């Protein structure tokens, strides 16, 4: 069985493309069921964040499986595959494992070392477990990814100087305004990103924080944490003129802020500048808002310049983290190989022993005067011949350094000898790695 990955990220696609194929985090049951209904896709997990959309799956047909996942991603969102495909990447086998381990360890993030991606993958895995689209292989695979991320976090300093996208937004605000002590921040949304942004803005010393959310209780809860003010979502545009910096991160499927809304707001501010940071995918703010005088709009892609300065200081720690990833890849593949190999060896030996016993019984039936000692010797002889015949193929199968060749050997033996292997028991999900 092969692990395959198909996806796109901030490295391969602009936000205008990523938002077209994003999955709603609150509506994962339907796409997950559709995913594992694809022919020859046996398990599947969907990861959808502001910076990436990825599908992890298992299949016996690597090329066909990858092609089907690409088609699924395009068709599910009614997006032309020919437009989407140039932005997609795909991996299988060791490369797929390396990619996911690196993503979970935040080595592939826009901001290397940021902790949010691990939580996002855990949430995605939780949905797959809940809706039963993951099985023994992806369960073990993602638990391994979580443990790799934990090793990276505890054995390197990659996260000690890391900044999140939310912190990068604060740094960008400081570049625009300089001193933020007389600035008021409006957070639209009450999720993790907004909470992180609130912490960073408070630490920077802003004058105040306002929070609005479609669920007012969540806005109140977040505002109370930072001695801020909760605003009813219906009153957003009545209160927006009081904010100098607006950070938006909702799960809305459409623009919630449009040019006509802001034209009235900026007039009430007597054209005092406003700084909008849209880190939602799909985007919350119509890009045409940026055409309005004294309005400055930035998206997640614009944060690249802010975070680039952190790359060099993390380079050494990243190298340590990459070494950990490589160690763990070998361990995981040893397990994955044994998952296919052990039942095949058992079935092969059982098949040979069945034939040996049948032929030995025929011989015994026709050899009426064979003494008991002779029977024992024939039993030992046929056992020895069987073991000699099976020694070489068994030894080759047990080697853990063969990569995808093991799959070829396993499939060949199963087909040549018509082997039936016992199904594996499901791995207990247990607790996710902290």
Curated annotation (Swiss-Prot):
Q: Which family does it belong to?
A: Belongs to the glutamyl-tRNA reductase family.
Answer yes or no on keyword NADP: yes
Q: Which CDD domains match?
A: NAD_bind_Glutamyl_tRNA_reduct
Q: What is the protein name stated in its UniProt record?
A: Glutamyl-tRNA reductase
Instruction: Supply the alphabetized keyword list.
Output: NADP, Oxidoreductase, Porphyrin biosynthesis
Which GO terms fall under molecular function for this chain's record? glutamyl-tRNA reductase activity; NADP binding
**Amino-acid positions noted as binding substrate in the UniProt annotation, renumbered to this chain:** 49-52, 109, 114-116, 120
Q: What class of enzyme is it?
A: oxidoreductase
Assigned EC number: 1.2.1.70
Q: Which residues bind NADP(+)?
A: 189-194
Lineage at the top is: Bacteria, Pseudomonadati, Thermodesulfobacteriota, Desulfuromonadia, Geobacterales
- What is recorded about the domains? Possesses an unusual extended V-shaped dimeric structure with each monomer consisting of three distinct domains arranged along a curved 'spinal' alpha-helix. The N-terminal catalytic domain specifically recognizes the glutamate moiety of the substrate. The second domain is the NADPH-binding domain, and the third C-terminal domain is responsible for dimerization.
Q: Which Gene3D superfamilies match?
A: Glutamyl-tRNA reductase, N-terminal domain (3.30.460.30), NAD(P)-binding Rossmann-like Domain (3.40.50.720)
One example of a Gene Ontology biological process annotation: protoporphyrinogen IX biosynthetic process from glutamate
Q: What reaction does this catalyse?
A: (S)-4-amino-5-oxopentanoate + tRNA(Glu) + NADP(+) = L-glutamyl-tRNA(Glu) + NADPH + H(+)
């Amino acid at each position: 069985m092969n692990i395959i990955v198909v996806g796109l990220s901030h490295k391969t696609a602009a936000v205008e493309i990523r938002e077209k194929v994003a999955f709603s985090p609150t509506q994962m049951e339907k796409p997950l069921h559709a995913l594992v209904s694809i022919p020859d896709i046996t398990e599947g997990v969907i990861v959808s964040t502001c910076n990436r959309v990825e599908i992890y799956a298992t299949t016996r047909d690597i090329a066909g499986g990858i092609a089907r996942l690409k088609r699924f991603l395009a068709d599910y969102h009614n997006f032309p595959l020919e437009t989407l495909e140039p932005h997609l990447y795909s991996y299988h086998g060791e490369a797929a494992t390396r990619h996911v381990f690196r993503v979970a360890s935040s080595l592939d993030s826009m901001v290397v070392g940021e902790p949010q991606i691990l939580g996002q993958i855990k949430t995605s895995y939780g949905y797959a477990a809940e809706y039963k689209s993951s099985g023994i292989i992806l369960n073990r695979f993602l638990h391994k990814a979580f443990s790799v991320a934990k090793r990276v976090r505890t054995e390197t300093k990659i996260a000690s100087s890391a900044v999140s996208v939310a912190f990068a937004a604060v740094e960008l605000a400081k570049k625009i305004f300089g001193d933020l002590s007389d600035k008021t921040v409006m957070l639209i949304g009450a999720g993790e990103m907004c909470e992180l942004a609130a912490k960073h803005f408070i630490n920077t010393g802003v004058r105040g924080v306002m929070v609005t959310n479609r669920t007012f209780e969540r806005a109140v809860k977040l505002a109370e944490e930072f001695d801020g003010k909760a605003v009813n979502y219906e009153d957003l545009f009545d209160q927006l003129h009081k904010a100098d910096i607006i950070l938006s991160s909702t799960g809305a499927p459409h623009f919630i802020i449009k040019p006509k809304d802001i034209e009235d707001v900026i007039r009430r501010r007597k054209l005092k500048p406003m700084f909008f940071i849209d880190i939602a995918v799909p985007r919350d703010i119509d890009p045409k808002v940026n055409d309005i005088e004294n309005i400055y709009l930035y998206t997640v892609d614009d944060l690249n310049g802010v975070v680039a300065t952190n790359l060099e200081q993390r380079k050494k720690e990243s190298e340590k983290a990459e070494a950990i990833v490589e160690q763990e890849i070998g361990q995981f593949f040893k397990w994955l190989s044994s998952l296919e190999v052990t039942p095949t060896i058992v079935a092969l030996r059982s098949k040979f022993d069945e034939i040996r016993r049948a032929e030995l019984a025929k011989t015994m039936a026709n050899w009426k005067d064979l003494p008991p000692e002779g029977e024992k010797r024939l039993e030992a002889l046929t056992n020895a011949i069987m073991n000699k015949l099976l020694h070489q193929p068994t030894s080759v199968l047990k080697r853990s350094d063969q990569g995808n060749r093991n799959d070829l050997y396993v499939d060949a033996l199963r087909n040549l000898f018509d082997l039936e292997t016992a199904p594996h028991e499901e791995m207990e999900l247990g607790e996710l790695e902290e």
